[in-house]
């Protein structure tokens, strides 16, 4: 297998909040030999949802605790380049968004738009990798497909 084939087999998942509040083990499963990118808006949404008394609130709290524990064990360099997890990497996006490639009507304050743009940037910056947006939000999937993400 060539190096480019190996890179293509490795996937980069950009995750949305909806997947994390519906599947508590999503991060552990997705990082197995892959890279998971956690956009800053997802951290903000988890923070808002963690106080809910519903099952989604419980899952958000569980996910936030897992992320906190994972970050606590990571070095400063790993926080910058990706935290090793299950043979893959967990990367935290800083929240700074390059608006190059933003479309007419793009709203940087709308989490879905910011996450889709981030996935689009990862696709362009890492053409050798398969970049996949993971969400349970049908409207977000439709918007992402319209942007060829």
Residue ranges with predicted function:
Residues 2-132, 138-149:
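Active-site-proximal, substrate-binding regions of enzyme catalytic domains
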């Amino acid at each position: 297998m060539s190096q480019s084939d190996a890179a293509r087999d490795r996937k980069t998942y950009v995750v949305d909040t909806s997947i994390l509040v519906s599947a508590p083990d999503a991060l552990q499963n997705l990082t197995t030999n892959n890279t998971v990118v956690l956009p800053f808006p997802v951290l903000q949404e988890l923070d808002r949802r963690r106080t809910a008394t519903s099952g989604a609130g419980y899952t958000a709290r569980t996910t936030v605790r897992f992320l906190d524990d994972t970050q606590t064990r990571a070095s400063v360099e790993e926080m910058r380049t990706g935290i090793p997890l299950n043979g893959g990497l967990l990367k935290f996006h800083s929240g700074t968004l390059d608006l190059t490639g933003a479309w007419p009507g793009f709203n940087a304050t709308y989490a879905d738009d910011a996450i889709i743009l981030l996935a689009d940037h990862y696709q362009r910056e890492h053409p050798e990798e398969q970049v996949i947006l993971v969400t349970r939000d049908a409207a977000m999937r439709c918007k992402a497909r319209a942007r060829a993400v």
